[in-house]
From Swiss-Prot:
Cited function: Required for meiosis I progression during spermatogenesis.
Cellular component aspect of the GO annotation: cytoplasm; membrane
Organism of derivation: Homo sapiens (Human)
GO molecular function, a single term: identical protein binding
Protein name: Meiosis 1 arrest protein
Subcellular location(s) per record: Cytoplasm
Keywords attached to this entry: Cytoplasm, Differentiation, Disease variant, Spermatogenesis
Organism lineage string: Eukaryota, Metazoa, Chordata, Craniata, Vertebrata
Record bears the keyword Cytoplasm: yes
Effect of substituting P389L: In SPGF48; uncertain significance
């Protein structure tokens, strides 16, 4: 299903998942650290983009650009559309693999600042171009700097170097320090964010400092966070609790408690990826997995998708065979439009609900209520969900079957005493199995990355008429070393109107990359257009 496609007589709506910000990744890793990090980083990037480029449905990422900073800054990839561009991204990842891993040179302190300024200038020119030519708007940019240097030192360097730079269009600024630690707890391999965050008011924006381990899984997980719907313009779900549900929460009987929540995916829908076991069954079905609670909750609307709790259930009273579809995670909202007191109260109530459900060993049965009535006079079918507590500040939401969906089934009771010989044989086989206390999906590989890469990769070579070869840069300590030519991602300059007073301020080293862009796909298809 594509953005804007309708599934009924109502108007099409674009979801917030379409509005993910463009991203600029700056790899700031000097020698000799690059030799240790290069392989893991390139593998993680290739795995990530094999997913991001091939996911059906609304685009999870809009634009992406890649810079490398060692002795100088270099634009490896100007801003390009991510979806459907795996071959181009794969070629640029190959560029990273080919960069020099040995030798010595002195890192230039201004190179990182120049990379940020050059990327910002590219983004401004690109957004100006697509706004006038394609009626698209890219209003803000997320910048991520992946560094092998001490993160706090890099933050201070950026604060000092960028204090005169206009960062008004930077939505988020991250510095991610790659550490040499080994992944100890793979099942919870999430980036660690430094919450101390020294004052970054010099720039008028905060710089988030995080650390990740130098291994493929940790880097993969960091990049996959880019696929989440990170919008905070409004809450996505209203969870409505009547006063009869929990007597320990005092509310008037005629005024149900409303918990404002954000919705987060737990995993990617397999039917949105080519080559998965069930991918061919529902990918084109307008009533398939893509029309889910997540999409309905993400619709930009004055009203919100509501989950009306109608009763409680014992945790032991739900058969897993009655749940279906993808699970989702509910969190207390972080919507910036709510005042601080309301956010705090909402989180406290959410915490109390999680605690009470765990203590009572209860689940909640809720009925989904769409944001508003459709144009049809027909009574819409309702969807019901079970809401399960956890030991974190989250709730798990799963769709549950109703009477209309049930098929007749018989389940004979299990006899108490199985046959002795059969019991011994089966127990002997079970004893030979390795027993794990928990299931860790990060330890189980389906070879999906390599499968997707083989589908969407193209033969190396001239992928685009504007691609051309360029002499490689020279390193001070490697002037006598024979280097091979590498393909660079360059295109014809976009027709731009120069901004008065800005041309003289552009660094000479970054001028070429600021003037070169990949055009959006619709412009590539029709080169005759102006």
């Amino acid at each position: 299903m594509h953005p804007g496609r309708t599934t009924g007589k109502g108007p099409s709506t674009h979801t917030q998942i379409d509005q993910q910000p463009p991203r600029l990744l700056i790899v700031h890793i000097a020698l000799p650290s690059w030799a240790d990090i290069c392989t893991n980083l390139c593998e993680a990037l290739q795995n990530f983009f094999s997913l991001a480029c091939s996911l059906m449905g609304p685009s999870r990422m809009s634009l992406f650009s890649l810079y490398m900073v060692q002795d100088q800054h270099e634009c490896i990839l100007p801003f390009v559309q991510v979806k459907g561009n795996f071959a181009r991204l794969q070629t640029c990842i190959s560029e990273l693999r080919m960069l020099q891993r040995e030798g010595c040179f002195r890192s230039q302190g201004a190179s990182l600042r120049l990379a940020v300024e050059d990327g910002l200038q590219q983004f401004k020119q690109y957004s100006r171009h697509v706004t006038t030519r394609a009626a698209l708007t890219y209003t803000s940019l997320e910048i991520t700097i992946l560094t092998s240097q001490p993160g706090k030192e890099v933050v201070k360097q950026l604060e000092e170097g960028l204090k005169d730079t206009d960062l008004a269009r930077v939505r988020r600024f991250q510095v991610v320090e790659v550490t040499k630690g080994i992944l100890e707890h793979v099942d919870s391999a999430s980036p660690v964010e430094d919450t101390s965050n020294d004052e970054s008011s010099i720039l008028g924006t905060d710089i988030d400092l995080q650390t990740i381990d130098n291994d493929i899984v940790s880097m993969e997980i960091f990049f996959k966070a880019w696929l989440h719907n990170s919008g905070t313009d409004q809450e996505q779900i209203h969870l409505l609790l009547s006063s009869q549900c929990f007597s320990n929460i005092s509310r008037p009987r005629d005024n149900p408690m409303c918990l404002k929540c954000d919705l987060q995916e737990r995993l990617l829908c397999p039917s949105l990826l080519a080559g998965t076991a069930d991918g061919s069954l529902r990918m084109d079905d307008p009533k398939g997995d893509f029309i889910t609670l997540y999409q309905m909750a993400s619709q930009s609307s004055a009203s919100h998708y509501k989950l009306q709790v109608i009763k409680a259930l014992k945790s032991s009273g739900l058969c897993e065979s009655l749940t279906y579809g993808l699970p989702f995670i509910l969190r207390p909202t972080s919507c910036w439009q709510l005042d601080w007191d309301e956010l705090e109260t909402n989180q406290q109530h959410f915490h109390a609900l999680c605690h009470s459900l765990l203590k009572r060993e209860w689940l909640l049965l809720a009925k989904g209520e769409p944001p508003g009535p459709g144009h049809s006079q027909r009574i819409p079918a309702s969807t019901f969900y079970v809401i399960m507590p956890s030991h974190s500040l989250t709730l798990l939401v799963k769709a549950v079957a109703t009477r209309e969906l049930m098929l007749p089934s018989t389940f004979p009771l299990l006899p108490e005493d199985p046959h002795d010989d059969s019991l011994k044989n089966v127990e002997s086989m079970l004893d030979s199995l390795e027993l794990e206390p928990t299931y860790n999906p990060l330890h189980v590989q389906s070879h999906l990355y390599s499968h997707l890469s083989s589908i969407y990769a193209k033969p190396q070579g001239r992928l685009h008429p504007h691609w051309e070869s360029r002499a490689p840069r020279k390193h001070p300590c490697k002037t006598g070393q024979l280097q091979t030519n590498r393909a660079r991602a360059t295109v014809a300059p976009l027709p731009m109107t120069p901004v008065p007073g800005r041309a003289s301020k552009m660094p000479a080293a970054s001028k070429s990359s600021s003037d070169a862009f990949f055009l959006p796909s619709e412009w590539e298809k029709d080169p005759s257009r102006p």
